[in-house]
């Protein structure tokens, strides 16, 4: 068996679906964004703001390649920008890859809700 890799745009449901599928299959779940934050000590948003989108995508790709090298088969939610990296494209060949789609309206609503939660988490009156 090989890893099951979920790809799609931000807000397409990779993390939510990934957790559910991993639980159903009895496999570990690896989330590219969470692994990046654990490795770097900061969020993807902060990396992009400080170093730019290319640096972010390079770091996301490095984290994803490490996850793909894990010997235990897992369900992996890939960061949207990471799957465009040439080394990641090559590494995904022959693996089980599922593209999650959502309508633009659904994506916008999910990203807006995520942005609200991120803002609320950092707002002094909410703490």
Per-segment meaning from a language model:
Residues 5, 75-77, 99:
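Structural motif
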Residues 28-91, 117, 123-124:
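ATP-dependent small-molecule kinase phosphotransfer cores
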Residues 4, 30, 96-98:
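Hydrophobic/aromatic beta-strand patches that form the interior of the parallel beta-sheet core
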């Amino acid at each position: 068996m090989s890893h099951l890799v979920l790809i799609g745009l931000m807000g397409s449901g990779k993390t939510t679906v990934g957790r559910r599928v991993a639980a159903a299959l009895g496999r570990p779940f690896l989330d590219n964004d969470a692994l990046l934050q654990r490795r770097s000590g900061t969020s993807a948003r902060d990396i992009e703001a400080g170093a730019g989108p290319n640096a972010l995508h390079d770091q996301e790709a490095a984290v994803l390649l490490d996850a793909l090298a894990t010997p235990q088969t897992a369900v992996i939610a890939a960061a949207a920008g990471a799957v465009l990296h040439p080394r990641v494209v090559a590494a995904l060949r022959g693996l089980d890859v599922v593209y999650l789609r959502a309508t633009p309206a659904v994506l916008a609503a999910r990203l807006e809700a995520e942005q609200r939660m991120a803002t609320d988490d950092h707002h002094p009156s909410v703490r």
